[in-house]
Each structure stands twice: as C-alpha cells, then as structure tokens.
Curated annotation (Swiss-Prot):
Chief subcellular location: cytoplasm
GO biological process: pyrimidine nucleotide metabolic process
A Pfam family matched in the record: Cytidylate_kin
A GO cellular component entry from the record: cytoplasm
Gene of this entry: cmk
Protein name, per record: Cytidylate kinase
UniProt-annotated binding residues for ATP: G7, P8, A9, A10, S11, G12, K13, G14, T15
Any GO molecular function: CMP kinase activity
Enzyme class, first EC level, given as a word: transferase
Lineage: Bacteria, Pseudomonadati, Pseudomonadota, Alphaproteobacteria, Hyphomicrobiales
Amino acid sequence: MIIAIDGPAASGKGTLARRLAAHFGLPHLDTGLLYRATARALLDHGHDLSDREAAISAARSLALTDFDEAGLRSRDMAEAASVVAAIPEVRAALVDMQRRFAGRPGGALLDGRDIGTVICPDADCKIFVTASDEARATRRALELRGRGEKVDYAAVLEDIRKRDLRDSSRAAAPLKPADDAVVLDTTKLDVEAAFKAALVIVESAHDSLRAGHPAF
C-alpha cells in the first residue's frame, strides 16, 4: 500500500506520517528533507540559493544517506528548502529518487507537498493535512523553542505565510490537494485526535483496496 500525505508547513503532516508508518509497518520518507539537504549542500559549498546550476547539480548528486536530520530541521533550513524547491529542475532531479522509494515491495508512506499530485498520483491513499495559519505558527514556534532556538511568533507566522505563497504559486508542482485526496483539518485537533482521524481514512482506503474498488 502506498500512502501519500501532503500539506503546508507545520500542519502536522510529519507527525502523522511517522505515526502512521509505524502503525502499518511501512518505510517512511519525509521528502522535505531532500530539499533541505539540497539547500544545505549548496550553502556548505559556498553557493547562493539562487544559483540554479549549482542547485540542480546538488539535487542530482543527493543520496538518501545524505541526511543529518537534526541539522536540517532549523527554521533557516526550512526557508532555504522552499527556495530551492521552487526550481523546476531541482524537483525533476528528485522525482525518480522519491518514486523508487515509493515502489518498494510492500508499499511505503511518503509525506511532502506534491506526493499525491506528482510523485505518486496513483497512491492507494491520499491525505492533505492542513490547519489555520495561526495554529501552524504556534506549533512551529513551540517546536523551534523546544530545540533551543529564540523565536518570535509574529516572525514565524510571517515566514509560514510567505512559504505558503511560494509553495502554492510555483510553476512546478504547486502545493495543492490532489483531486482524490481526503482533506484533514487539524486546527482544533491534538496529536492523538489527528492520528485517529488519519487512521480512519487510511483504514477505509485499505478496506476499499482489499475489496478491489477505488479507494475513494
């Protein structure tokens, strides 16, 4: 079974993805890390984030083992990832890697921004996780403070809105729900309630798959 989870920053999709992957025993790929690692490689080699050729080269050279996940979770790296993700050739360079991961025997779970629309358009289950701007900013601020970063809520909210605009308006694979995705609004849900809601969606898709019918 292939599960695609998409959504904007701090919507809760990453937490849901990890919980669901563990529950169903599926390998999990946070595809956002690919773009963060690409941006990190650019900066480490002294390139500007707007250097298209360097960004494309970094993406093509990336391997799934190139992740120092803790070092990629900062607010700065999130912003940098959004910049390089807007380069169509970078996205194209990373598509095959993501599809190979999704094609593993037994299935996989991928989360990102274009899994259900571009990477795995035929996924067995698609969930688009969203929440209000304010709820997402609150979550992101708490997350960053938990890592010891000094955070201003207003600045985090502004960053999220800018990133939403960039992600949804880019020419290549803009952020949007797949036509057959189930939208899950987590604004008023805690982690456990969101997980239970997502579990119902996935189990419904799984039951439909076993019955030989389209998931939705």
